[in-house]
UniProtKB/Swiss-Prot annotation:
GO terms for biological process: mRNA processing; RNA splicing; tRNA processing. GO terms for molecular function: RNA binding. The keyword Transcription regulation does not apply. Usually encoded in the trnK tRNA gene intron. Probably assists in splicing its own and other chloroplast group II introns. It is found in: Plastid, Chloroplast. It comes from Arabidopsis lyrata. This is Maturase K. The lineage of its organism: Eukaryota, Viridiplantae, Streptophyta, Embryophyta, Tracheophyta. Its main location: plastid. GO terms for cellular component: chloroplast. HAMAP family: MatK (MF_01390). Keywords: Chloroplast, mRNA processing, Plastid, RNA-binding, tRNA processing. Belongs to the intron maturase 2 family. MatK subfamily. Coiled coil: none annotated.
Amino acid sequence: MEKFQGYLEFDGARQQSFLYPLFFREYIYVLAYDHGLNRLNRNRSIFLENTDYDKKYSSLIVKRLILRMYEQNRLIIPTKDLNQNSFLGHTSLFYYQMISVLFAVIVEIPFSLRLGSSFQGKQFKKSYNLQSIHSIFPFLEDKLAHFNYVLDVLIPYPIHLEILVQILRYWVKDASSLHFFRFCLYEYCNCKNFYIKKKSILNPRFFLFLYNSHVCEYESIFFFLRKRSSHLRSPSYEVLFERIFFYGKIQDFFKVFVNNFPAILGLLKDPFIHYVRYHGRCILATKDTPLLMNKWKYFFVNLWQCYFSVWFQSQKVNINQLSKDNLEFLGYLSSLRLNPLVVRSQMLENSFLIDNVRIKLDSKIPISSIIGSLAKDKFCNVLGHPISKATWTDSSDSDILNRFVRICRNISHYYSGSSKKKNLYRIKYILRLCCVKTLARKHKSTVRAFLKRLGSVLLEEFLTGEDQVLSLIFPRSYYASKRLYRVRIWYLDILYLNDLVNHE
């Protein structure tokens, strides 16, 4: 974003946060479609696939679009003609897509400048390991072992476009930009049928920005209330009454109730609450009682319904007891496992046994969900039996082999933290046999005949890369003792989920 700072010196736009004039500057379109800023379209997006309308970008299209925006009436087209009405060889929806790309980039400018100014004079150590998805699992192993309940919340999406506009009002102070954004958003989303049929043409950067702004508003309210929440603490020998969360003034509360209870009232803030958000879900881990977990549950329901005007059912908030239930978290099934430990103690001539229980976070592979994903992509059937990949038979042998090896390594890389590797070996077996069947089908041969000819070479391709990585991490003696296959490994270089892992 540093490259934008030199362009924001015109007309006092930077000082007064006027973003609307930027929509009429050609260089902003050039920067918006720059490869460095548009890298989300090259990588696999969480929400949408790669867009292809950016290939049609040219300076002539930008100039015509700017001229058309000066005449705003020409942008208003009936919904039924949105796809048919063309302007210089492109539909009006195409121009709304270009504006959405530009709007996502423009709105990021004041936030990046504000963030950079707040960090001036401060020294921060950058830890790229914390960007990894696997970095959350060691944290949960240390924290969840001391908790007993987890609140699993499905974050709802806003059902009305005006909710998104209202959220942006707190961030963008430029009224012209907000009105223009509202106009383009409504015109862009009116064609509902076209949106459903042509999901691949949508802009992932634009909708990722809208989703993040929506979630940021929700989390700011939640964290504000969480810091100010308290519950009553009563001694066991005094009057017992329910611990109630409240958000009123503490002094007024004491004036009302201090004369009615002979017990000494105490306020206690429970610090043992951890919040983690991933994709469209969030979890709230705590050591509270089931009664307080239910109150947190209905707090989320009331927050979404009353503040965001979103109908949110209580069934979308699940209370899981980690000692009994499994928590589906980032492609893993996590639960607490009790490991009994017997310690023999001896004092002088007497010896006795001490039974201890060690609580450990157990992470398992959801084999049924992954087999369902593999079956959906035609690697196997619904029962987990490998089948040939017919759509890949037109590729070369090396290309087919490299595809299967890459998928197998990615899944093995991600699920290396599983406590039970049996399911991981089953997934590898499905992919290897699917690769053999695909190559045998291409060469019009049987699987047995093909394995006799290239069996050892094929197996070596699947094992070489993974063994080389593990041998660099662990010493040779540890690697040779086969204890490595019982150890959980968390890699700190995984920045996004694979499609087969992202089965939610």
